[in-house]
Amino acid sequence: MDWQKITEKMCDFIQEKVKNSQSQGVVLGLSGGIDSALVATLCKRALKENVFALLMPTQISNKANLEDALRLCADLNLEYKIIEIQSILDAFIKQSENTTLVSLGNFAARIRMSLLYDYSALKNSLVIGTSNKSELLLGYGTIYGDLACAFNPIGSLYKSEIYALAKYLNLHENFIKKAPSADLWENQSDEADLGFSYTKIDEGLKALETNDEKLLRTLDPSLIAMLKNRMQKNAFKGKMPEILEI
């Protein structure tokens, strides 16, 4: 892939969306993971200024992720704010009857998105998305949480392609080497949740997207079954609510 042209196209897209909305800039959640780090880097290239990052750890968030996010803010000279959301999460735990790890992870994602939209209004800026194509196809995210945004410059790149672009843009090796994780609970791992590496997942997704029967026959049947199941079960996450026409 021509990463120079792709980078230019993404930067043009960011500039266009901000200009057409008459916004001042963008707001993003910076987790310390590779996706948000890549988007922050693209935003800085595109806009030069008015890129505001919110770092929103919980008590169990990986400290290394916060350190990496802070280093990136320093490297890019980003305006940022740290908001620890544990007290908000604790209030939910006291009131809720559903406190499974998944439920708490989803609620934490929605807390973060609420804060992002609050700051987007405060700064007259757009919330920019950080989900990649692999996550979007699988519905691997929280509806009205990390999936919510005004626009998304990286949603057409598979996770494996995110790594390639990150290397091209010389992101710090910490982002490239760390295991992918939404950091929703302690020691949470995307690939452990999904049961396969992103390399295999992306291979399967591409085969399904192009309906490459020859390639599909060579892939692990359990991988293809998992992908089809998640894509079908979570398809609603990528759609606007249906409205009855009278």
Curated annotation (Swiss-Prot):
Pathway: Cofactor biosynthesis; NAD(+) biosynthesis; NAD(+) from deamido-NAD(+) (ammonia route): step 1/1. Its EC number is 6.3.1.5. InterPro entries: NAD/GMP_synthase, NAD_synthase, NH(3)-dep_NAD(+)_synth, Rossmann-like_a/b/a_fold. It comes from the Bacteria. Keywords: ATP-binding, Ligase, Magnesium, Metal-binding, NAD, Nucleotide-binding. SUPFAM superfamilies: Adenine nucleotide alpha hydrolases-like (SSF52402). One of its GO terms (molecular function) is NAD+ synthase (glutamine-hydrolyzing) activity. CDD domains: NAD_synthase (cd00553). Deamido-NAD(+) binds at residue 110. One of its GO terms (biological process) is NAD biosynthetic process. The keyword ATP-binding applies. One of its GO terms (cellular component) is cytoplasm. ATP binds at residues 29-36, 130, 159, 181. Homodimer. Belongs to the NAD synthetase family. Catalyzes the ATP-dependent amidation of deamido-NAD to form NAD. Uses ammonia as a nitrogen source. NCBIfam families: nadE (TIGR00552), PRK13980.1 (NF010587). This is NH(3)-dependent NAD(+) synthetase.
